[in-house]
Amino acid sequence: TSVQVRGITLKEPTVRALNGKVMISNPNPNSELRYTLDGSAPTERSAVYPSSGLEFFTGILRYRVFAKEGCGQTYTLYLSKSGHLFRDVPTNSWYFESIDRAVSLDLLKGVGDFAYEPDGGLNRAMFVTMLARAVGESLPDSAAGFSDVKGGQWYTAAMSWALRKNLIRGYEDGSYRPEALITREEMCVILDRLMQQRGETCL
């Protein structure tokens, strides 16, 4: 993506995790990339971002592309020692460690560009997929058997697994409505069915 700042088009730097480091590439010619690690806004006196990258740590990384006359664009990333990058999960939030752990366990994938929408709702497809990943069973490579769950979707295999396990049953019209938000009562029913099958009182 790019933004217009005082008539100048600035492209967003490319961020990636590589060998335990945060690598940031600045695609803008005649500009500098400066950063801070204390949460403050980078200035022209801040350190230049090293081409070798920064070691992962738990904290805030703010970086700014400085073009001519001091104009530029600032970006913020939240990092964890476990090697994860977040755009919208502050390290001082009450849920940071839980989301960081869920990502480490491959339960969460995010919505792209290191964003996770922590305040967003959870739909029925997301919940079943997270549950399937948490249980760790092999997932069938087949359609789920619902009229609105087609093959090849990111949640199809998890839906098929949950249906075969009789954890989900869908609606009378044969649909599952995967994009609909899941309610707490629906989550409790699915969890209860799973725990009964596993002979457990908790996951």
What does each model-identified segment do?
Residues 78-96, 104, 109-158, 164-185, ...:
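Feature responds to low-complexity, polar/acidic, surface-exposed segments characteristic
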Residues 100:
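Extracellular S/T/G-rich loop segment that most often corresponds to the catalytic His/Ser-adjacent loop
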Residues 21-23, 32, 43, 50, ...:
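Residues in flexible loops and secondary-structure boundaries
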